[in-house]
A protein has these predicted regions:
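Regulatory modules associated with amino-acid/nitrogen control
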Residues: 1-88, 112-131
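A generic structural motif
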Residues: 41-46, 100-106
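A cross-kingdom feature marking solvent-exposed beta-strand/loop segments within repeated
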Residues: 88-103, 109-111, 128-131
Length: 131
């Protein structure tokens, strides 16, 4: 089965906050965001268009979405994608949801990531017009 990944047109920033930080309500009005919290800190991935006062931030990430549906019985999807990108020395930031996986790569490595994935037989949708 040939996997399809869609490239989101937005760029994203990964923010770091203290574990007890209160996020602005505007965060929750965004179309897409991801929050992770541990005892050490709170991480937020959100569109770079939203400026936030975080402890640290890493801007310039592009996002691949693995198009599904993906069942919990499907194994190795993230491993295969990350392995393909690792072979090309492309760092990733991976996020999984109940429905699918998201793989973020730095903007300056996006073209290389697309080429590497296509070479391995992945179908890449690069604009909403292709959906």
């Amino acid at each position: 089965m040939r996997m399809t990944l869609a490239v989101h047109p937005e760029q994203y920033t990964i923010h770091s906050f203290s574990p007890n930080a209160v996020l602005p309500s505007e965060v929750f009005a965004q179309d897409m965001y991801f929050i992770g919290k541990t005892q050490e800190g709170l991480s937020l991935v959100i569109s770079s268009e939203m400026e936030l006062d975080s402890l640290e931030q890493e801007p310039g990430w592009c996002c691949f979405e693995v198009l599904g549906p993906l069942g919990f019985s499907m194994t190795g999807i993230l491993s295969k994608v990350s392995g393909t990108l690792a072979d090309e020395q492309i760092s990733i930031f991976a996020i999984s949801t109940f429905d699918t996986d998201y793989i973020l790569v730095k903007n300056n490595r996006l073209k290389s990531a697309i080429a590497a994935l296509k070479k391995q037989g992945y179908h890449i949708i690069e604009s909403k017009d292709e959906v």
